[in-house]
């Protein structure tokens, strides 16, 4: 990966990444790796400590092969930690050379694919490298201030007649692109400033979806994330995994690793084709990029019923991205930070009528393509009752466990999902 940010030759004589956990655990970790047959890795790692870039990259490649030697759940934790170690060695060498882009790329791969042992070293190193990189470019403080750059989603015109015209055209467009019968059945109820007691009584316990409005205004993300200059400043050089293709059920679907700035550029210019959109989907971005994590707040609703947060994921993509009909095992709040989405929901008791896949890996996904229903193959699906809504910017949707849902972005969209369960639900799921 080519570094976007590099220090001049005279600026990096004293650049060093402190890695206290790696320093303390290195010998023990190498012994554990050797015990699993990783003798060649251990030899390369020793050379990497001395600054041998080829050896550091060779060790990283060896660990990468182990990560892809079988199903992810079967990979030994020691090899995940080995990959983190190698990424740190590669990053240290690039950082010492003032190659900040390459260093950040290596650290991000460690955060995305590595184990937990060296995670603090990875995070702390990202902060230090990012700080040095910002000295060479526009500062974060400037980008966080008075935003005047390009917006991801244009502001609505203030002229009343123009607003009506835009809304009328938007409604016609939406109806053309949405699945058959959209917005004709029961709409998901919207509640403004819903109390925790009301949420528990009326929606959580009965297991009923609800759209909650006026509960995200205090999030810094509500203003910051609509500005490309801010997103590029805090995360532009970071490496993220993206999906390319219509959706994960299609044969041509694939994954790529790109810098966040390249991903934003694809969204902004709509360079990906409608059949191959680029989507940053269900990625724990906020475990990786702390600055973006600081821009959001965990809704208090996620702690109702003695709940514990299970995962926190980002869903960033252009208009037209689709998550096909599926269900999840946990309570879910989907917070719409930028843009808008159409969401259709079916209750869990309609599982048989929605024809789930029999394969274990896809058993939570429906064979029914709502965008093109085959009535001959799936005769029960066409007439099923459902609930749906258009989730507007600044709104949150509560989706109960096991409720089937289909999601389509109507504009460029940045969303955050919060999954949570109580102890009893976690043990049974």
UniProtKB/Swiss-Prot annotation:
Residues where Fe cation binds: 326, 328, 405
SMART domains: JmjC
Main location per the UniProt record: nucleus
Listed GO MF terms: DNA-binding transcription factor activity; histone H3K27me2/H3K27me3 demethylase activity; histone H3K27me3 reader activity; histone H3K36 methyltransferase activity; histone H3K36me/H3K36me2 demethylase activity; histone H3K36me2/H3K36me3 demethylase activity; histone H3K9me2/H3K9me3 demethylase activity; metal ion binding
Induction (record text): Circadian-regulation with a broad peak in the late day and early night. Stabilized at elevated temperatures (at protein level). Induced by abscisic acid (ABA) specifically during the post-germination stage in an ABI3-dependent manner. Repressed by brassinosteroids (BR) during the post-germination stage.
Cofactor note: Binds 1 Fe(2+) ion per subunit.
Domain JmjC, first and last residues per copy: 272-429
Catalysed reactions, as listed in the record: N(6),N(6),N(6)-trimethyl-L-lysyl(36)-[histone H3] + 2 2-oxoglutarate + 2 O2 = N(6)-methyl-L-lysyl(36)-[histone H3] + 2 formaldehyde + 2 succinate + 2 CO2; N(6),N(6),N(6)-trimethyl-L-lysyl(27)-[histone H3] + 2 2-oxoglutarate + 2 O2 = N(6)-methyl-L-lysyl(27)-[histone H3] + 2 formaldehyde + 2 succinate + 2 CO2; N(6),N(6)-dimethyl-L-lysyl(36)-[histone H3] + 2 2-oxoglutarate + 2 O2 = L-lysyl(36)-[histone H3] + 2 formaldehyde + 2 succinate + 2 CO2
Claim: Transport is one of the keywords in the record: no
GO biological process, one term: regulation of abscisic acid-activated signaling pathway
Keywords from the named record: Abscisic acid signaling pathway, Brassinosteroid signaling pathway, Cytoplasm, Dioxygenase, Endoplasmic reticulum, Flowering, Iron, Metal-binding, Nucleus, Oxidoreductase
Record-level GO cellular component terms: cytoplasm; endoplasmic reticulum; euchromatin; nucleus
Localization in the cell: Nucleus; Cytoplasm; Endoplasmic reticulum
Free-text tissue specificity from the UniProt record: Expressed ubiquitously in vasculatures, roots, rosette leaves, stems, inflorescences and siliques. Mainly present in the root meristem and root differentiation area. Observed at high level in callus.
InterPro entries (alphabetical): ARM_KDM8_N, Cupin_8, JmjC_dom
Keyword Oxidoreductase assigned: yes
Protein family per UniProt: Belongs to the JARID1 histone demethylase family.
Chain's role: Histone demethylase that demethylates 'Lys-36' (H3K36me) of histone H3 with a specific activity for H3K36me3 and H3K36me2. Also active on 'Lys-27' (H3K27me) of histone H3 with a specific activity for H3K27me3 and H3K27me2. No activity on H3K36me1 and H3K27me1. Involved in the control of flowering time by demethylating H3K36me2 at the FT locus and repressing its expression.
Assembly mode: Interacts with EFM. Binds to ATXR2, ARF7 and ARF19.
Additional remarks: Plants over-expressing JMJD5 show delayed flowering.
Full protein name: Lysine-specific demethylase JMJ30
Organism of derivation: Arabidopsis thaliana
Name of encoding gene: JMJ30
């Amino acid at each position: 990966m080519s570094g976007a940010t590099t220090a001049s030759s005279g600026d990096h004589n004293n650049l060093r990444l402190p890695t206290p956990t790696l320093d303390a655990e290195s010998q023990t970790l190498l012994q554990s790796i050797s015990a699993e047959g990783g003798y060649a890795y251990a030899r390369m790692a020793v050379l990497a400590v001395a600054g041998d870039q080829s050896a550091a990259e060779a060790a990283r490649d060896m660990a990468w092969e182990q990560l892809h030697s079988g199903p992810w759940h079967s990979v030994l934790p020691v090899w995940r930690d080995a990959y983190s170690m190698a990424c740190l060695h590669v990053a240290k060498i690039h950082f010492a050379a003032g190659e900040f882009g390459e260093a950040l790329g290596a650290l991000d791969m460690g955060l995305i694919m590595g184990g937990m042992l060296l995670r603090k070293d990875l995070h702390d190193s990202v902060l230090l490298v990012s700080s040095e990189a910002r000295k060479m470019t526009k500062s974060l403080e400037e980008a966080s201030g008075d935003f005047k750059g390009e917006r991801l989603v244009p502001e609505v015109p203030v002229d009343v007649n123009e607003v009506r015209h835009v809304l009328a055209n938007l409604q016609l467009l939406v109806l053309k692109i949405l699945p058959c019968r959209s917005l004709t059945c029961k709409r998901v109820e919207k509640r403004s400033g819903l109390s925790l007691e009301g949420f528990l009584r009326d929606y959580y316990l009965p297991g009923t979806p609800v759209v909650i409005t006026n509960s995200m205004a205090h999030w810094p993300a509500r203003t910051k994330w609509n500005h490309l200059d801010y997103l590029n400043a805090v995360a532009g050089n970071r490496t993220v995994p993206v999906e390319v293709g219509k959706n994960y059920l299609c044969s041509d679907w694939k994954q790529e690793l790109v810098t966040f700035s390249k991903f934003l550029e694809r969204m902004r210019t709509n360079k990906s084709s409608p059949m191959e959109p680029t989507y940053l989907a269900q990625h724990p971005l906020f475990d990786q990029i702390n600055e973006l994590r600081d821009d959001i707040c965990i809704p208090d609703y996620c702690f109702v019923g003695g709940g514990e947060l299970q995962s926190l994921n980002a869903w960033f993509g252009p208009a037209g991205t689709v998550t096909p009909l599926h269900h999840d095992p946990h309570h879910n709040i989907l917070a719409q930070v930028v843009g808008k989405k159409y969401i259709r929901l079916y209750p869990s008791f309609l599982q048989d009528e929605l024809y789930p896949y029999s394969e274990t890996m896809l058993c939570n996904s429906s064979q029914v393509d709502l965008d093109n229903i085959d009535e001959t193959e799936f005769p029960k699906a066409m007439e099923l009752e459902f609930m749906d809504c258009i989730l507007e910017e600044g709104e949150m949707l509560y989706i109960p466990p096991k409720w089937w849902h289909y999601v389509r972005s109507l504009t460029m969209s940045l969303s955050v999902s919060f999954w949570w369960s109580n102890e009893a639900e976690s043990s049974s799921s």
